Swiss-Prot record:
NCBIfam families for the chain: lolA
One GO term (biological process): lipoprotein transport
HAMAP family given in the database record: LolA
Organism: Escherichia coli (strain K12)
Protein name: Outer-membrane lipoprotein carrier protein
GO annotation, cellular component aspect: outer membrane-bounded periplasmic space
Subcellular location: Periplasm
One Pfam family of this chain: LolA
Function: Participates in the translocation of lipoproteins from the inner membrane to the outer membrane. Only forms a complex with a lipoprotein if the residue after the N-terminal Cys is not an aspartate (The Asp acts as a targeting signal to indicate that the lipoprotein should stay in the inner membrane); the inner membrane retention signal functions at the release step. May act as a regulator of the RCS-phosphorelay signal transduction pathway.
Impact noted for substituting R64L: Loss of ability to transfer lipoproteins to LolB
Domain of life: Bacteria
Length: 203
């Protein structure tokens, strides 16, 4: 009986690993179908009890693997731009911009996962699939991300994604009007406006 139990446990583990691998492969394959796009989005943040913390909206431009522009317009404007090497974060309200090397930025965030779509990133997660929904749970428990969910169609269109942090705060993003196709290269460049304080952390 003990040998049977061990065999069943091993088979169960192998089946689970195969399912996770298939889900990761399907997710990457779907995202690979769209190399660049623009979409508007709405954001809703809730705390562990489900109470609303913040609602917002903005626009998103992506050209994989490393070019993106995340422009939050409400409730407070902020801009996150990657030119492929430098990651810029600009807060117009405080007139401050921060520059860091993209290679040093954490990949353990939903947006970075979507923008890069690299196999090495997806391998850090156990992934379960239910139709167009993919639920990702980090294999390592030392990060702030508890769970990441993304809904992406077979044509590569992202409909929504959400992230749950360790304190159960949930950030949900609904994408709409996704336009697949070439994006103006100017969207992936950033020059700090005159008078803005720059914190350059690339040194």
């Amino acid at each position: 009986m003990k040998k049977i139990a061990i065999t069943c446990a091993l088979l169960s583990s192998l089946v689970a690993s195969s399912v996770w691998a298939d889900a990761a492969s399907d997710l990457k394959s779907r995202l690979d179908k769209v190399s660049s796009f623009h979409a508007s989005f709405t954001q809703k943040v809730t705390d562990g009890s489900g109470a609303a913390v913040q609602e917002g909206q903005g626009d998103l431009w992506v050209k994989r693997p490393n070019l993106f522009n995340w422009h939050m317009t409400q409730p407070d404007e902020s801009i996150l731009v990657s030119d492929g090497k430098t990651l810029w974060f600009y807060n117009p309200f405080v007139e401050q911009a921060t520059a860091t090397w993209l290679k040093d930025a954490t990949g353990n965030t939903p947006f970075m996962l979507i923008a890069r779509n690299q196999s090495s990133d997806w391998q850090q997660y156990n992934i379960k699939q239910n139709g167009d929904d993919f639920v990702l749970t980090p294999k390592a428990s030392n990060g702030n991300l508890k769970q990441f969910t993304i809904n992406v169609g077979r044509d590569g269109t992202i409909h929504q994604f959400s992230a749950v942090e360790q304190d159960d705060q949930r950030s949900s993003y609904q994408l709409k009007s996704q336009q697949n196709g070439a994006v103006d290269a100017a969207k992936f460049t950033f020059t700090p406006p005159q008078g803005v304080t720059v914190d350059d952390q690339r040194k």
